[in-house]
A protein has these predicted regions:
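Short acidic (Asp/Glu) and glycine-rich catalytic loops that position anionic groups and cofactors
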Residues: 6-9, 97-99
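Conserved C-terminal helix/tail region of periplasmic/extracytoplasmic solute-binding proteins
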Residues: 81-127
Length: 127
């Protein structure tokens, strides 16, 4: 099976053991996380938010066009820390979000090497 594009995913979950104020705080955190600021920060590093539409208001039109729509940058594209990542006229490798995600052919939830890496990590931290 030919792989069209590789992608990573992440998510947030709530422990079934939470209740009361702790459960309320967990939901408040997740709502904040998905409200846009975090997504805008992540997208400036080349990652995507689970709710990209909320990220748009925390990005300039040029940033949104470059990172999400696959458009050529109109000016410098900066990382969240201010480092220049692309200049005017440059386009993101792989195209728009829809082009990139539309090319995913096979989605694996865990890499083949996962168990090996976990064992090696545990050996490292136990040393």
């Amino acid at each position: 099976l030919e792989e069209g594009y590789r992608s990573w995913g992440g998510g947030l979950g709530i422990s079934a053991a939470l209740s009361g104020i702790e459960l309320d705080a967990a939901y408040e955190y997740i709502n904040w996380y998905l409200s846009g600021w975090v997504g805008g920060y992540l997208m400036r590093q080349g990652y995507y938010s689970a709710v990209p539409e909320t990220s748009k208001e925390f990005m300039s039109a040029d940033e949104w066009g470059f990172w999400y729509e696959g458009k050529a940058a109109e000016g410098d594209i900066l990382s969240p820390t201010g480092n220049k990542l692309a200049g005017a006229g440059e386009v993101r490798d792989g195209g728009s979000f829809f082009d990139r995600m539309g090319s995913v052919v096979c989605w694996n939830s865990v890499m083949d090497e996962n168990q090996y890496m976990v064992r090696k990590w545990n050996e490292f931290i136990a040393a």
